[in-house]
Structures are given as C-alpha cells and as structure tokens.
Amino acid sequence: MSFASDMKNELTRIDVDESNAKAELSALIRMNGALSLSNQQFVINIQTENATTARRIYSLIKRIFNVEVEILVRKKMKLKKNNIYICRTKVRAKEILDELGILKNGIFVHDIDASMIKDDEMRRSYLRGAFLAGGSVNNPETSSYHLEIFSQYENHSEGLTKLMNSYGLNAKHLERKKGSIAYLKEAEKISDFLSLIGGYQALLKFEDVRIVRDMRNSVNRLVNCETANLNKTVSAAMKQVESIQLIEQEIGLDNLPDRLREIAKLRVEHQEISLKELGEMISTGPISKSGVNHRLRKLNELADKIRSGEKIEL
C-alpha cells in the first residue's frame, strides 16, 4: 500500500462523536457525492476508490441518520482498473443533505457550511473528511514533499485553503483542469496537518523519513563542500609544485633565499598536506597559514617571471 492509502486507513479508524461525525461526512459527501432522481425518488451516491473510506461513509451515515445504505462495487475501465466503491442511500436523501449543510432551499451549496465548522474539533473533522474524499500525499521516501486536497468546486477549495491556514499551515490554492486544489509543500506544515486530522502513525513515519532525508542531505552537502575544498587544495598544490620544479630547473633551489628554499623543498616532499601542516614543519619554528601562502605565492611569481622571460633578481 502507498503512504497515502495507509494514512487514509488510519484516519477511518478514528472514533468521533456525532457533531464531528457530521462534519466529516459533510466534507465526504460535498466532495464525492451526487444527488440523482430514480423512480421518483432522490438518491445520494458517494463515490470513492478506497475501500476503507467507503466503509467509513457507510458507518457514518448509518450511525447519524439510521437509514439503509448499500455499497456497490464497479470496475474502473480506463487506465488503472481499480475498483470504484459507491455508497448509496435512497432514504431521506434531501433531509440528509440539508442537515449536513450541503443543500439549502433545494439548492446545492458549494461553500463550507458554518454549522459544520463551529469549533476546533469540527474543523479538524471536516479537514479529515476532505482529505479522505480528495486528498493525496507524496511518499516522503521517494519524492518531494507535497500534500493536496482536490475539490471540483473552486469556492470550496478556497474555503479548504482558508480553513487550513486558520491553523498556520501556509496552504496555497491552485486551479486545475477539472477543479481546484489546496496544497502544502513544506515538510513541517505537512507534519502539522497530519497531526491536526489525527494521522499520528502517518506522522511518525513521515517524521522518521524526514529526519533521515535531512541528515542525508546535510552529509551530502558536507561531503560536496569537503570535496570542493580538497580539489582546490590539490589544484593549488599541483601549480606550486610545477612552479618549484621550473625554478629548480632554471635557477636551482639552492640559489633561493633560505625561507623560500625551505618551503619549496617541503612542498615538493609533502604535496598532499595543507598549508597549516606545512607551516608547522618550518625548521625555525611554526609559521601561520598566511605566512606559508605568502612564501608559496612568491615562488609562483618567480616561476611566472621565468616563463615570461623577465629578468630574475633574488
């Protein structure tokens, strides 16, 4: 199972009281439900591809309204041939929609009804229902951090974005071809959202993966930095050795001043060590890194003069 499927399975096992159950069911039906007329009778169909979500819808309707509900299973014919689960109720359909704030005076309302988000627990429950209906979250082990909730109706999606941001989640809203999404891109905010809607097992897994990824990224940055510094050190050392070899060939190291002769011989003999380590090997006593660099720069300048044919004065 995917990370998102595991999370939805966890969410469907949360116990809620009646007001929170209504808030959750309101989001589920508003986003995945449809009202139709069959044999002069109104019918509510709520569709999902997740079996545990279908069972959740079934149990919430039975519990709150005590009406008969059936679950139909259809096979999806396009692309992935997943099952589609349809929860259907033919009893008190308009009354159910009216009580859940979805139907008012015979007209469908696409905004989030205020009666469904009266307090903190109901707001959390509504967001949980919205995620069960249209939510997805990337597997944190294999891709970038991303959580979204899709809704067919732009004003409902904007309402979800606003509701998420009432908890400081920095959610963004984006229009898509067949609807709109409210989404999160920050790992910390995704963690907060998982906690907010009760996905605590998913939160623990997400945080475990996040810690490992952050550590791996930190190590990679450190290794890259160390590698870059090492490459610079090796490149500089190679140039210094080339300059010293040219001076040896054209002038002879014994003709150099003592301080330059000693550092030249040390560099050729110890090409792999740092400037600091070279400075600690000076016979008259340790000198600083900048002091070593100054002497080596003098040797490079001398070699450049030899290459350009300038007059050499020692």
UniProtKB/Swiss-Prot annotation:
Residues 274-308 bind DNA. One of its GO terms (biological process) is regulation of sporulation. One of its GO terms (molecular function) is DNA binding. Signal peptide: none annotated. Keywords: Cell cycle, Cell division, DNA-binding. Pfam families: HTH_WhiA, LAGLIDADG_WhiA, WhiA_N. SUPFAM superfamilies: Homing endonucleases. HAMAP family: HTH_type_WhiA. Belongs to the WhiA family. Involved in cell division and chromosome segregation. This is Probable cell division protein WhiA. It comes from Staphylococcus haemolyticus (strain JCSC1435).
